[in-house]
Amino acid sequence: MKKRCYILPSILFLFFFSYGRILLYLQKDIHVGFTALYAPTLKDIGIGILILLVCYALSKANLIASYVLALVLGVFHLANVEYIYALDHVVNLKDITMASDKEFIAGTLFHVSFPVYSILLMASLMASIFFLRKLPLFKLKTKRYNLLAFAGLLILYLVIAVQSSGDWKNGNFVSASIRNSVALLTFNEEALTDYPPDIERQINTSQQLKDGEYLLNNHTGKKNILMVVMEGIPGAYSPANQEFLNIPNDIKMSSLDKIKDHSLILPNYITHNNQTIRGMYSLVSGDYPKMDASTPKAYEYLQKDPSYREELLPKLLKNRGYNTAFIQAAELEYMSKGDFMTAAGFDTVIGGESFRNPYVPFGWGPDDKAFFEQSQKYIDELNGKGKPWFAAMLTVGTHHPYAVTDDYAKQYPSRKAAAVAYLNEALSGFIDYIDHSSFAKDTLVLFVSDESHGVNDQPYGSNWGVFAAYSPDIDGQIINDGVYGQKDILLSLLDYADPDLDAYTTGRSVFRKYTEDSPILFASHYNGDIFYSTEKGTVYQVDNSGQLYSLTSENGELFSSKYGRTSLSDSTLKKKILTYKNYIDKSSAGDQKIVITKDKEIPLTDGGEAVVTDGQFITLPAESYVDIQVDYDASSMAAADWLVLKFEDYSGHKSVRMIDKQNRSGKITFRFYNEKVGYGYAFNLKTALHSNDYSGADKAIRINRITVEFSKTVSAASPSPAASAGMSAGPTPSASSGPEHVEVVDMDAGNE
């Protein structure tokens, strides 16, 4: 009887482990029948049993190690529950290294969506190991045999995981994470480089502006353009989309009803991939972002000689007499959006550091209400410079863990729903500001999204963006039901702003109605799926296992309440789609050096810490030395001042360097060896001033350039004596005798 009680915690763990799926269905209000639920639940139970056996075998060899493994697997399961709840995707292991995950995990720890469930699952798992160890499940005599049993079970689990479904609705969460990660890391792109000569036409369009009927017949002259980009908002939240497509949603952005009488709506609007920097690049470039998680095209754009860069939307509008400004809530250093937007042609670039006194403290930047209210000053200043003008705004409050107070969140079923409601209120006030402004009658306003944080029961809901245009030029509400994507915005705004634009220009404008469809591609780098459509209502999907499917909407639109899904064996079509993906993903930089930022002046205050750069999302080549070089000048420091330069990446490399009067200018290189291809690599660089100077003089550090360089062999330079692994407590003597300090920090020699 006593031994039977020993298995009770294991039974409870299996129940809680499999109940996570049901919990998500209930909280996300997804209705499924028993037939759709029992098979995935049985998989959860089977994987749960295997996890218990793996931990049991390890406990016989090393009890502490088994608890550590159980902790990792339990937290990984709970992280997937949070990720699915927030973004409708499982965690991809490559994303663990991303800077965004640090904020995601930190936010989750303070705002766990299912605290009781999390505690019960972890407690039952730990108790299972404790009590199962008392049972003679494996009668193995030596530690060696127990380790072999553990290794065999672990390999079996990994094999099952790799072969399982990558969709959380059909497979176990942890297994799906492992499967998707392995699939993305082993994707073979080398065999898909036979590009047809007309590939641009095949992935974009052969249509010309003149092929579409212009829908804004009342539009005259050059008007101001304001583009409001809302973090992660899917098209499912648009009241007009819900009504037109007959797809109800518990979340509705009623503020968009205020523009109903003078609006143009795109119900079939695509965001081409996940991640803000990719969406923003597509909006201002008229180009696809990469369909995978490799180095964003925005960084590759920065590497090009300025005289050879393609002219992007801000520059093209500036050439037509527009004053331009980019205003975002997040700090400009993150993802180097400040550098990219400046290179893109914006005259003025404003980031989160320019916003004060938020209503809700939030790590990513000002909350949406504070952002919209304080942005009015910058828009008024831009308007005062003369017309016409173009401004792009980017919110951040609907990014996980969401900029709302706990009391506000309690009024809604989830923090995400609360954050969208808060954005809705803030946007309503901002629309009122526009309506009462002096520029209201002369301005086109676009409400769009940078990406989509997912929609329940939508096979590509992570690519359903919102688009609503608002202008006195628009009489009533126009529904343009064609399929458009972020890449179409550039030409659309030129079509709007420039009446002399050549009608024979190749491309599509959202302000025109076309009788024929055009090709479009989109993807989710969370799970590696790629989608391709040439006809509205039919989408081809290649999942990360290489299986080809046809998705057919019931209503004939791109988005529907029901879809038919058919497995196809058309190898020619599959190869064509993957070839398109590879063509879009190929690097345009060509060299082995990436410039992260340059010519940046960072003001310093005593005791204050400033972010120099963060969130780069770079692809690291295999078997290469990685050199991250910081070229700096801190000559404005007083003799008694010293600086701390803190380097940390999400692979565990850390270093703290001291800068004082002896090494106030120079180059510090952080070097490490990278064994395997790494996607989404990011590092954080901060600086802090320690001053004994009370003169009140302004002080700053100038970052001449930060570069990331790859090489197969280590350069001739070797780590300086000052680049030891130990962390210094204060200023250290310079490692070079000349006026410019040169230091190479070997990150593989130690973490500090």
Give the positions of each predicted feature.
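Transmembrane and membrane-interface helices of multi-pass
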Residues: 1-181
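Soluble catalytic regions of membrane-associated enzymes that act on cell-envelope
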Residues: 175-505, 512-525
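Extra-cytoplasmic beta-strand recognition segments
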Residues: 317, 614-637, 666-674, 706-708
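Membrane-interface soluble catalytic domains
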Residues: 332-335, 475-606, 704, 709-721, ...
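Solvent-exposed, conformationally flexible loop/turn segments
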Residues: 597-599, 605-608, 623-625, 661-667
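Extracellular ligand-binding interfaces
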Residues: 608, 631-668, 674
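Short beta-strand/loop motifs in extracellular/secreted proteins, especially
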Residues: 624-626, 638-643, 681, 699, ...
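Extracellular beta-strand ligand-recognition surfaces/modules
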Residues: 670-702, 706
